[in-house]
Amino acid sequence: MSQTDIHVANAASMSQDDARYLISLIRTVPDFPREGILFRDFMPVFADSRGLRILLDALIAALPVHTDEFDAVAGLEARGFLFGPALAAQLGKGFIAIRKAGKLPPPVHACSYALEYGKATLEIEDTSVRNNERILIVDDLIATGGSAAAAKDLIESAGGKVAGYEFVMELEGLDGRTALGDYPYGSLLKMPA
C-alpha cells in the first residue's frame, strides 16, 4: 500500500492540488513499530512549510463544530501537541495538553483505558479545564477510538464538556468512530487500516 490508498475525507477542506501535495508528504512504513503494522508517518508535513499551512488551513475548514461552540482545544500526546497549539492559536483559543501518565506535576485528573495488550493512562493538570468549558479534542489519528474516548472521559471528569473531535487521519475498518458516541466528529484523511 502507498499514498494512493489515502483519500480526503472532507473534500471541502482543501483543493485537489493541496490534497495531493499533503498526501505526497505522508510516508508509508511497513512493519513499524512491529510486523504487520502499516505505519503512516506524517512528520514530514511539519518540516514542509507549505504542507504545514495546508494542514492547518484544512483542519480549520473541516472543523466539526463552529468556533463559537468550543472554548479551548485539547491535544493528545504526542502528535496532537504538534498541531493542536497552532490550531488553537489561529482560532483564538487556549490549548490543553493531554499527557501520558507521570509527565505532569500533581494534582492531576487521570483516566485509564484498555489497549490491545494492557492499559494506558492519560492525565491533565487539575487546573487545565474550567467548569463547563467546551473542549474540541484533536489528535493525529483515530484507529479504535480508545484514546479519544479516554480523553473525553478525562475532560468530563475535570468538569469540562466535549464539543467534538477532529483528527488528521482515520484508519478505516477499525470502527473508531463508534467509540466516540454521538459527538460531532471530523477527519481530513482516510486510509485502510
Swiss-Prot record:
It is an enzyme of class 2 (transferase). Its EC number is 2.4.2.7. The keyword Transcription regulation does not apply. Pfam families: Pribosyltran. GO terms for molecular function: adenine binding; adenine phosphoribosyltransferase activity; AMP binding. GO terms for biological process: adenine salvage; AMP salvage; purine ribonucleoside salvage. SUPFAM superfamilies: PRTase-like. It catalyses: AMP + diphosphate = 5-phospho-alpha-D-ribose 1-diphosphate + adenine. Pathway: Purine metabolism; AMP biosynthesis via salvage pathway; AMP from adenine: step 1/1. One of its GO terms (cellular component) is cytoplasm. It is found in: Cytoplasm. Keywords: Cytoplasm, Glycosyltransferase, Purine salvage, Transferase. Belongs to the purine/pyrimidine phosphoribosyltransferase family. Homodimer. HAMAP family: Aden_phosphoribosyltr (MF_00004). NCBIfam families: apt (TIGR01090), PRK02304.1-3 (NF002634), PRK02304.1-5 (NF002636). Catalyzes a salvage reaction resulting in the formation of AMP, that is energically less costly than de novo synthesis. This is Adenine phosphoribosyltransferase. It comes from Bifidobacterium animalis subsp. lactis (strain AD011).
